[in-house]
Structure formats: C-alpha cells, structure tokens
Amino acid sequence: MIAIHILLLVFSNIVLPALCINVFVYGTLKKGQSNYHELTNTTHGQAEFITCARTKDPYPMVIATKDKFPFLLNVPGSGQQVYGEIYNVDQNMLDFLDEFEECPDLYQRTSIQLKILKGNGDSEEAFVYSTSTFDPDWLNKPTFSVYDATGDPGNNCVSRE
C-alpha cells in the first residue's frame, strides 16, 4: 500500500509535455507581418518557430479582397509553390487560430505536405489554413509564391533557401 502511494506521489509531480502540432503560415501570421503578434501572444497558447518551408505542390495563393489578405485556395496542382514558416503550437494556440481564421467558414484547416528549405530539404506535414469556399473568379486572379505586405524581401523565407 505504501508503494502505491509513493508511486502516485512521484507521478503526480510529472508535467507532461504540451501537445505539439505543426502549423504552416504563409501570410499575415508570418514574422514581420501584420498579425505575427498573435502567434507570440502567450495568452492564446504557445507557438515556437521551427523552420522555413514551401508547399511541396503548387497552390494558388491570391489577393482577392480590398483588405489585400492572402488566400491559399485548396486547389493543389494549380498556382505556385508557396513559401512560409512552420510553427509548433499547442492545442490552445490551435484553438485560437481556428477562431482567428474563422475556421471552418472562411478557411478550413487541412493537412499539407511541405519541403523544408534548410538542410537536406526534408519533407514535413503540417496543418494549413486554406479555403475551398471561394468565388470561382478567384481562380483567374494572379497567383503568388510569397506574401509580404511590407514589400521587404528580408521578411520572407525565400532569401534563406
């Protein structure tokens, strides 16, 4: 009986690591962009920069609204390979991002294959916020591989390849 109590005391002091989830950001949540502060706000949860990456397959990333926010259209095989950043987030941050990205109404969180830009160019899987609910005319808009609202090429991952 004493051994069981000691065992329970030992295990009650162990802090299990937070659930870690990879998320690929390609627009306003990237470092240096207008909503990056949301990823660094610990009241939303935890997020840690992992590396720069690009989509394995091309996707159309378009600027389709007057606000000039990027939309990654969930149409793999069309458009360009999109560059962005992979963050490791906890469940609280993922829940916040779902709400922030108006998931599932505006964006949908889906899994995507990525190519890491540093090292051997390994592949990685991550969640991304893309949309399948868009005006069909958006497919006729110009596509981009990099989003940078500041116009500063130092604020994107392409230069780190």
UniProtKB/Swiss-Prot annotation:
It comes from the Eukaryota. Substrate binds at residues 26-29. One of its GO terms (cellular component) is cytosol. SUPFAM superfamilies: Gamma-glutamyl cyclotransferase-like. The keyword Lyase applies. It catalyses: epsilon-(gamma-L-glutamyl)-L-lysine = 5-oxo-L-proline + L-lysine. Keywords: Lyase. The active site is at residue 101. It holds the Pfam family GGACT. Coiled coil: none annotated. GO terms for molecular function: gamma-glutamylaminecyclotransferase activity. Its EC number is 4.3.2.8. InterPro entries: AIG2-like_dom, GGACT, GGCT-like, GGCT-like_sf. GO terms for biological process: modified amino acid catabolic process. May contribute to degradation of proteins cross-linked by transglutaminases by degrading the cross-link between a lysine and a glutamic acid residue. Catalyzes the formation of 5-oxo-L-proline from L-gamma-glutamyl-L-epsilon-lysine. Belongs to the gamma-glutamylcyclotransferase family. This is Gamma-glutamylaminecyclotransferase A. It comes from Danio rerio (Zebrafish). The gene is ggact.1.
